[in-house]
Amino acid sequence: MVGTTTTDVPPTMGVKIFSAGVAACLADVITFPLDTAKVRQQIQGEFPITSGIRYKGVLGTITTLAKTEGPLKLYSGLPAGLQRQISFASLRIGLYDTVQEFFTSGEETPSLGSKISAGLTTGGVAVFIGQPTEVVKVRLQAQSHLHGLKPRYTGTYNAYRIIATTESLTSLWKGTTPNLLRNVIINCTELVTYDLMKGALVRNEILADDVPCHFVSALIAGFCTTLLSSPVDVVKTRFINSPPGQYASVPNCAMTMFTKEGPTAFFKGFVPSFLRLGSWNVIMFVCFEKLKGELMRSRQTVDCAT
């Protein structure tokens, strides 16, 4: 299981939730420029007014952003991103083992079905709770002051207020459907692949349950997740970032992309998306496993002392 550590005592649900939140925030801080590059590539070609600047490749996108809008633009939306990890990743990852045990129904070895069911459940709940932070994060990453475009928002909390007052409170949940589909795919693929890879490596004595095992499992999980979730991710980003009335619905957004830009539009930003998700997975899972272990060892030490 994702929650298994090398300590004798299994981590509590609270330890898992806390560890997942902290590890996810650390991973977000380190990989956020890649996420911003992914968003910019995904919306490229949507508005003719921004056609003066073209983003080419991961490094090209990052350097172009830094030169034209300043290095800090790479971290625009980070506060909302951290809020997202606290409300989203802590639940979808931290609750995974607990929910999986519920679906296992006393079975000694969790089935693939119980793993997928756990991923679907925790991913769905986390998306609904964390969607407002996702909307604000994407819009702050996407907005640009170039070519006469006036930024819609001056900061994180200003974005929450303007979206709620000028559009509607429900607009903070805009794009919930594609984001739900995206994160159900991500959660199931990411956690189940990591779980299966880690179990196979340890069970077959290829690697011990330590950093190298966590690294390999997380990287493979990141690639599989990016491949399956990319089309939905691009549609989600376009729909969330769109002004009111641009797209009639999520299917209309997808169809507009297909007819105007072709099928390759659904894989825009794939490389930065994989680099971001792959590195995010490695950092998050390695820190998650280590933090859980240290917290449980500290707890055992305190219990022994008392």
Swiss-Prot record:
Renumbered ranges of Solcar repeats: 11-102, 110-200, 209-294
Transmembrane segment boundaries: 11-32, 74-96, 116-132, 178-194, 212-231, 266-288
Mitochondrial intermembrane side: 1-10, 97-115, 195-211, 289-306
Membrane topology of this protein: Multi-pass membrane protein
SUPFAM superfamilies according to UniProt: Mitochondrial carrier
PTM summary: May undergo sulfenylation upon cold exposure. May increase the sensitivity of UCP1 thermogenic function to the activation by noradrenaline probably through structural effects. May undergo ubiquitin-mediated proteasomal degradation.
Residues annotated to bind fatty acid 16:0: 56, 268
Positions bearing Cysteine sulfenic acid (-SOH): 253
Homology family: Belongs to the mitochondrial carrier (TC 2.A.29) family.
Protein name, UniProt field: Mitochondrial brown fat uncoupling protein 1
Originating organism: Oryctolagus cuniculus
